[in-house]
Amino acid sequence: MNPVRRRKLFILLFALTILSAAAALVLYALRQNISLFYTPTQIVAGEAPVKHHIRVGGMVEANSIVRAKKGLDVQFKITDFENTIVVTYSGILPDLFREGQGIVAEGEVTDNHHFHAIQVLAKHDANYMPPQVKSALADKVKQ
């Protein structure tokens, strides 16, 4: 093989290897940051993956907030007005967190009716609701 042609082939193969590695790293990073959204009904139905990072949204059920006597542990229930799941969280809750409030929790499903949250997000004002929660709740009201 001609030395010039061989050098061009080597450079091309090297560039393709570098680009492939970069693409693989980008896809791996994106895969680690993707959090799919589920409703309490989907979790109860077993549609949500167990032990995978997901988001769940709904309304905090009335009289369901139970705080530990010591520490920052909190347990509460969220509902989509069809099904309810228990959420456990250890940390400081947002100031806007309260019963009847729309929230999105990030964490893992431990079983069909329990969710362990690592982050809890509350809506910012009276008119805001995450689009996924709004559409899921609208579907439940229409039925």
From Swiss-Prot:
GO terms for biological process: cytochrome complex assembly. GO terms for cellular component: plasma membrane. InterPro entries: CcmE, CcmE-like_sf, NA-bd_OB-fold. The keyword Transmembrane helix applies. Keywords: Cell inner membrane, Cell membrane, Cytochrome c-type biogenesis, Heme, Iron, Membrane, Metal-binding, Signal-anchor, Transmembrane, Transmembrane helix. It comes from the Bacteria. GO terms for molecular function: heme binding; metal ion binding. Heme chaperone required for the biogenesis of c-type cytochromes. Transiently binds heme delivered by CcmC and transfers the heme to apo-cytochromes in a process facilitated by CcmF and CcmH. This is Cytochrome c-type biogenesis protein CcmE. It comes from Legionella pneumophila (strain Corby). The gene is ccmE.
